[in-house]
From Swiss-Prot:
Protein name: UvrABC system protein B
Keyword Hydrolase attributed: no
Primary site of residence: cytoplasm
Gene (name only): uvrB
Motif (Beta-hairpin): 93-116
Organism: Gloeobacter violaceus (strain ATCC 29082 / PCC 7421)
GO molecular function: ATP binding; ATP hydrolysis activity; DNA binding; excinuclease ABC activity
Residue span(s) of domain Helicase ATP-binding: 27-422
Domain notes for this protein: The beta-hairpin motif is involved in DNA binding.
């Protein structure tokens, strides 16, 4: 491992109450405090604060987000802050996933089907490789990282060490590559494949888009080089390196046979149990399915649904927690939970949904009982693995604050505690938005008047309703009156959601209406007004935390305002308004003391998510493709993911035909397009 230290690179220094929060959280982590909370208002630079804490603490860090999109945004920000350190991205690699299921009511069996995103799979392998080879690692992950991943000990033990001057027979290297699930393909070399050309073996590692070339002289390794995958040019030569397995699930041959014996024993016991209950159909079904899987495992070392045998393959005890990404971290690691009030409930809920589906499959003879141990971690198992954690939220939950040695003031409702760092001051001097309460009667026409005012100033408006029907009706009403408005609903996929938000920022439309999608993680500096309809209807969507989060969507604009339409002041409204006013007073006093004039937040419109080039959102026809390839600088951001995908195909085709100049042109265009997406 390297001894590299984290080094933050930024064109500005911590200001406001960032220095105090950084000092408090760093001292706590270095002093052995297990749980801390960063209670930071929207737009106060929480990510920058956490980056500085990571630099001072110096521990490998897992940053947990509650969805792929937010994880991608965090990954981009942290890569900008840590250009010389390893900032990795680890989320579910499925573009599409239909889990195996059985519906007894209709006797319907649904086979597992999935589409794996090759780019994300590479990033996952890159994350685990970095954790083995260096300490200056930040892994930004979604909650899917608590699913089983394969044992890190076996993964590391299976790695193939190569060193210049070492003696190894070429055929032995090929055998080892096959053992760790690389495929030989002398025609099309790619990730997880290798080819042989005389005394040269070329390998496409699972964790890089470059090629490893191993040159032999007899039985001696003469040279090890990294190659450009398109031109074949040598990027650099190295003295030694490890080739990690092509899959995270690695089972040695002797362990595989032991696993098959254990599966046979469990099958025998399960068949006897089902026959004893006179469930003859289920007994025949499990016997037939499992014997077929065993034959496949012994012949090729793999079968469909092999993950359902993971308990036996990993030699775990019944009920024992599976290995996951956390087990790849060293002992002294740090957990950062972003938007903790949303992410922590996800951790608690992951196990229950999975367990219910598996139980039905097991009861009806589709899977052995041990399949239940192919699962995500239970919440207690997850927290048992955590050494130190920092919870980050504008509205942390009671549980996080209590763990951080604090609680809620019964009179004011304010969160505070010994290990709770509060961050209220924005570096830009922008105050929390003003909050107004107006009657429900005439709310739509009043809102329409406010929208016209904002549109005249080229500002944007967010409107949140209680029901999908009301959002649809309101959208139609505003459209009929000439307002450029869009409706954001729950069926919209992550990539399209990014495009809609980008279009709002660009001014393609002025008003965005939604139900529960206008809260955490929306960074929209152009929004100057947030309207909350039916604010006095108590419930999840109008609870104190939800209201504070929604208010925060207008907290990045100098003229930010929030209008709550309500006929009465609920307890949640009162607490949210009081907390917002408390923050405004602190911010106003700080600005006056430091002569600070609020400045608008400037955020590049082309700064986009890593997900934009990891998922293809639309197809381009051939004419559009040729035009886009000829002038990549003029391509619409929304079209870049597909253009990159198709240019990569043409680049590989050109390379196969040995047309390296043309392939290099494609490579350069792809590089420029990706830089545009990443805002470089």
């Amino acid at each position: 491992m390297t001894d590299d230290r984290f080094v933050v690179s930024a064109p500005y220094r911590p200001t406001g109450d960032q220095p105090r929060a950084i000092a408090q959280l760093s001292a706590g982590a270095l002093g052995g405090v297990t749980f801390q909370t960063l209670l930071g208002a929207t737009g106060t630079g929480k990510t920058f604060t956490i980056a500085n804490v990571i630099e001072k603490v110096g521990k490998p860090t897992l940053v947990l987000a509650h969805n792929k999109t937010l994880a991608a945004q965090l990954c981009n920000e942290l890569r900008e802050f840590f250009p010389d350190n390893a900032v990795e991205y680890f989320v579910s690699y499925y573009d599409y996933y239909q889990p195996e299921a059985y519906i007894p009511q209709t006797d319907t069996y649904i086979e597992k089907s999935a589409s794996i995103n090759d780019e994300i799979d590479m990033l996952r392998h890159s994350a685990t490789r970095s954790l083995f080879e260096r300490r200056d690692v930040i892994v930004v992950a979604s909650v899917s990282c608590i699913y089983g991943l394969g044992m890190p000990e076996e993964y590391l033990r299976a790695a193939i060490p190569l060193k210049v001057g070492s003696n190894i027979d070429q055929r032995e290297l090929l055998r080892q590559l096959v053992t760790v699930q690389y495929e030989r393909n002398d025609i099309d070399l790619g990730r997880g494949r290798f080819r042989v050309r005389g005394d040269v073996v070329e390998i496409g590692p699972a964790y890089e888009d470059r090629i490893i070339r191993v040159e032999f002289f007899g039985d001696e390794v003469e040279a090890v080089r990294w190659l450009d995958p398109v031109t074949g040019e040598v990027v650099r030569s190295v003295n030694s390196l490890n080739i990690y397995p092509a899959k995270h699930f690695v089972t040695p041959e002797e362990q595989l046979e032991q696993a098959c014996i254990a599966i046979e024993q469990e099958l025998e016991a399960r068949v006897a149990e089902l026959e004893g209950e006179n469930k003859l159909l289920e007994a025949q079904r499990i016997k037939q399915r499992t014997r077929y899987d065993l034959e496949m495992l012994r012949e090729v070392g793999y079968c469909n649904g092999v993950e359902n045998y993971s308990r036996h393959l990993a030699a775990r005890r019944p009920g024992e927690a599976p290995s996951c990404l956390i087990d790849y971290f060293p002992q002294d690691w740090l957990l950062v939970v972003d938007e903790s009030h949303v992410t922590i409930p996800q951790i608690r809920g992951m196990y229950n949904g999975d367990a219910q589906r598996k139980k039905v499959l097991i009861d009806h003879g589709f899977r052995l009982p041990s399949a239940a141990d192919n699962r995500p971690l239970k919440a207690p198992e997850f927290w048992d693995k955590v050494r130190q954690a920092i919870f980050v939220s504008a509205t942390p939950g009671d549980w996080e604050v209590e763990l951080s040695g604090g609680g809620r003031d019964p009179e004011t409702g304010r969160m505070a505690g010994e290990h709770v760092a509060e961050q209220i001051i924005r570096p830009t001097g922008v105050l929390d938005p003003e909050v107004f309460v107006r009657p429900v009667a005439g709310q739509v026409d009043d809102l329409l008047h406010e929208i016209h005012d904002r549109v005249a100033r080229r500002e944007r408006v967010l409107v949140t309703t209680l029901t999908k029907r009301m959002a649809e009706d309101l959208t139609e009403y505003f459209q009929e009156r000439g307002v450029k408005v869009r409706y954001l609903h729950s069926e919209i996929q992550a990539i399209e959601r990014i495009e809609i938000l980008q279009a709002l920022r660009q001014g393609d439309f002025d008003v965005l209406i939604g139900v529960n999608l206008l809260r955490e993680g929306l960074d929209l500096p152009e929004v100057s007004l947030v309207a909350i309809l039916d604010a006095d209807k108590e419930g999840f969507l109008r609870a104190e935390r939800s209201l504070i989060q929604t208010i925060g969507r207008a907290a990045r604009h100098v003229r930010g305002q929030v209008i709550m339409y309500a006929d009465r002041l609920t307890a949640s409204m009162d607490k949210a308004i009081s907390e917002t006013e408390r923050r405004r007073q602190i911010q106003r006093a700080y600005n006056a003391a430091h002569g600070l004039t609020p400045q608008p937040i400037v955020k590049r419109l082309d700064a986009n998510s890593i997900l934009d080039y990891l998922a293809v959102s639309r197809r381009l026809n051939q004419q559009e493709l040729e035009a886009a390839a000829a002038a990549p600088a003029e391509v619409a951001l929304a079209d870049i993911p597909e253009l990159v995908s198709q240019l990569e195909i043409q680049m590989r085709d050109a390379a196969k035909k040995l047309e390296f100049e043309k392939a290099a042109e494609y490579r350069d265009k792809i590089h420029k397009l990706r830089e545009r997406l990443l805002g470089k």
